[in-house]
Amino acid sequence: MTTVSEILGINYVVIAPTLALLLTVIVLLFCTITISTPMYVKKYVSFVGILLTLFTIFLKFGLFLTDGVSSYFTEKILLDEFALVGNVLVGMVLLFTFNSFWKTSELIEDKTTEALILILMSASGFLLMIDAENFIMLFIGLEIGSISLYALAGLNRGDQLSNEAALKYFLLGRNCIVEPDSSDIPHFLSG
């Protein structure tokens, strides 16, 4: 007897790196909003979250070695060599640039954790984009990653250039939504 998860191809190991980053973001948000947590604890939590992401990428290698190239979540997420290489690249960039973006975000004083949360959200969107098998999932991953970067560009509200960059990226990025939607109108009308 097959279960619903087997029919739909649900396997959480495939999206585990994205889920690990989102879990790290939720813990950092909790530490920022509800309780006053020292910066070294937030730095430790984010570093452990990045290591957990790298571990889940390692688990994806094991799944790939047992199942080979496979499709999951009703052909929305693809596990192949290119997705694994992309996941490793994003994970290594997160690991090796962790200290530098922590030091850079300290220049914004009170918004250090917010900058780190936006960077991790952007990375989770790009991980989802790398694993996408169809264009809708690719677009969702791109939007998660890019909206976080738009907010990151405008994080320093006291700087006029930061506000200008955020507005410019936001307006140019919104064109990505308007244009695909307007190009689908003839398709929807024809059935």
Sequence positions of predicted segments:
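Alpha-helical transmembrane segments of multi-pass membrane proteins predominantly involved
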Residues: M1-G191
